[in-house]
């Protein structure tokens, strides 16, 4: 399921514009934002044209797997890389928040996937403060979802049911 803050925001926008598929526009927009962030990060690199071509090939290849989970991974990853490589703490925090909120279940795997980068940035580049930002954003997503689920019995029952039905369907 999608994180509660993002869900509520999208529902409000969808209610304002009922004839427009806000969810699809949001998904395409965030997909584009994530790859724009990757390309932005390459602007100072040598061989940037070659790297941009590779990024674009990956972008078009991933269109075949255009899902909330893939976009969540892309957004969160691009946000983390922006956080450590640029002085754009607010923008990168928003991108990470939206990425983790888009598919809450990807948080652990994104952290594991980027663990080496985070560790490197802490040890070599001494970017402990940025790691605290990352931890705060992650905790914020987890906390808002946890609080909402625990205070809304209908949602809690649905999530319990959905988790059990997913176990049956996945095996």
Report the location of each language-model feature.
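Short hydrophobic/aromatic helix or loop-helix immediately within or flanking a transmembrane segment
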Residues: 1-30
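Transmembrane-helix motifs of polytopic, lipid-linked glycan transferases
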Residues: 28-46
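Membrane-interface helix-boundary motifs at transmembrane edges
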Residues: 42-48, 85-88, 121-132
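Aromatic- and kink-enriched transmembrane "portal" helix at the membrane-lumen/periplasm boundary
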Residues: 52-76, 101
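Membrane-interface alpha helices of multi-pass inner-membrane proteins
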Residues: 57-59, 90-106, 115, 138-144
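Membrane-interface transmembrane helices that cradle and orient dolichyl/undecaprenyl
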Residues: 78-91
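Perimembrane helix-loop-helix junctions
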Residues: 109-139
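Juxtamembrane membrane-water interface segments immediately following transmembrane helices
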Residues: 131-171
């Amino acid at each position: 399921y999608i994180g509660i803050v993002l869900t509520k925001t999208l529902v409000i926008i969808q209610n304002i514009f009922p004839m427009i598929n806000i969810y699809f526009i949001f998904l395409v927009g965030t997909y584009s934002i994530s790859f724009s962030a990757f390309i932005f990060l390459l602007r100072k690199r040598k061989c940037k044209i070659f790297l941009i071509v590779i990024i674009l090939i990956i972008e078009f290849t991933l269109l075949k797997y255009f899902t909330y989970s893939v976009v969540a991974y892309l957004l969160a990853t691009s946000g983390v890389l922006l956080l450590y490589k640029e002085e754009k703490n607010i923008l990168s925090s928003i991108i990470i928040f939206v990425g983790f909120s888009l598919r809450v279940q990807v948080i652990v795997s994104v952290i594991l996937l980027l663990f080496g980068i985070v560790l490197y940035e802490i040890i070599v580049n001494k970017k402990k403060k940025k790691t605290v930002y990352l931890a705060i954003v992650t905790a914020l997503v987890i906390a808002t979802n946890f609080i909402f689920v625990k205070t809304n019995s209908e949602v809690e029952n649905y999530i319990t049911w959905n988790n059990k039905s997913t176990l049956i369907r996945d095996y």
